[in-house]
Amino acid sequence: MAAKLLVTGGFPNQAPNEVIDLKNENNHCNNIGDDLSGKFKYGTVGGLLNDQPVICGGAYIDTNQCYTVKDQGTLLSGTLHENRMFSASAVINDSLWITGGFDGSSLSKATEMFHLALGKSTPGPELPYPVYHHCVAKINDFQAMMIGGFYNLNPPYLYDFQQEAWTVLPSLMEPRGMAGCATFEEQGQVKVIVSGGTMNGQVFSSTEILDVQSGTWRQGPELPQTLYKHSMVTQNNQVYVIGGETKQGYQSTIYRMECSELLECHWQELTQKIQTPRCQFTAMLVPDELAKCEQN
């Protein structure tokens, strides 16, 4: 079971890996893998493949390479077809679906599926438009949603891997890039939440929640502060916002969305924090056996 939070890379460039126990504030966890700054810096993507954390792309070194984070170090696990930074990804059918991004000269609308067992990727479905600094939310085992990004006002799209087709969805209430997104269930229905982000120089504290079945957006709970370049994860149907950047600089805070039976939600700041404040990093949940934690 994926129960611990792994944070890798990001600004500042020398930020080490960190493992955080989201459920027990008294636990201190040993970090896994070595410092990623010598391999890539920020703007990476990643996911858990075969219970192993995999990180791909990023600026500006080895932007087409993928690494597996292990106890003994961060090991090269394969390559991508394209250089990619500021992409977005989701784990689909035990492969990492990597979408869009920037190759150093232009935006991409190509996608690829990285297969850990093969150590390489295969072409994925082409995006409706080139984009970076966007977000991808996994809806289920065969559907994922692409949201926001620069530099356009395009609506979100849902891709169905079984039907091999894109479906356009209703536009966000506020267009945004560098936002975070995650999924959760509410009364048995899948929801997508989008938080923070920026557009035209404005940084947002607002959140929006999509009812996937009805295709309607509603306002979500306001973040405690304006925030962008952060990450979001969902553990046991609880949504977390991690790190990011504000006008005051890089953030170490972790917020959890808490909702009443009346579906009134707010953000609760956790005692746990990132030891090195950072933004534009990759965060994912990893199995307990990968992270050794003990009481402080």
Language model feature labels by segment:
Residues 1-296:
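Kelch-like beta-propeller repeat domains
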